[in-house]
Amino acid sequence: MSQWLYRRWRSEDGAALIEAALTLPLLLLLSVSIIEFGRAYQVYQVVTNAAREGARVAVLPGTSTSDVTTRVQAYLQAGQISNPSSATVQITSTTISIGAGTAAASRVEVDYPFSFMVLQPVANLVAGGSTLGTPLTLSAVATMRNE
């Protein structure tokens, strides 16, 4: 009887199952994190381009702030950003230095609250509703010389 127990104890049956059970959640979390951060970077690129498009409209003579905001939100919509109306657009007039002189310019800043689809609920579950699950604000600024 003792020899049978010894063989069962030394047997490696089920070791692969335990190793997979320990490593699979970590690999799954790593894969989901890569996908989520890739998605966040794609949204950041769209927000940056929307700020640039807004600056292009803002430098034209006779445009209003509503024209700039409409163009930024239209670009966010075309970039398939969820809820583009949640983005805040700030337009300011400024001066920039060009060589030895200065020129009038328009500065457009776009702030967009980005929520992770998978990681945010997991963070809320693990951390018990702490600030880990709050949306990340993606900001982009574009400044262009007025025409």
Located regions from the model:
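N-terminal leader/signal peptides at the extreme start of proteins
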Residues: M1-D13
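Short, conserved structural patches
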Residues: S2-Q3, Y44, R52-E147
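N-terminal signal-anchor/signal peptide hydrophobic helix marking the start
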Residues: D13-L26
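Catalytic tyrosine of NAD(P)H-dependent dehydrogenase/reductases that use a Tyr as the general acid/base
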Residues: A15, V32, A40
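Conserved G/P- and acidic residue-centered "switch" motifs that form tight phosphate/ATP-binding loops
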Residues: E19, E36, A51
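Alpha-helical transmembrane segments of integral membrane proteins
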Residues: T23-E36
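Alpha-helical transmembrane segments
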Residues: R39-T48
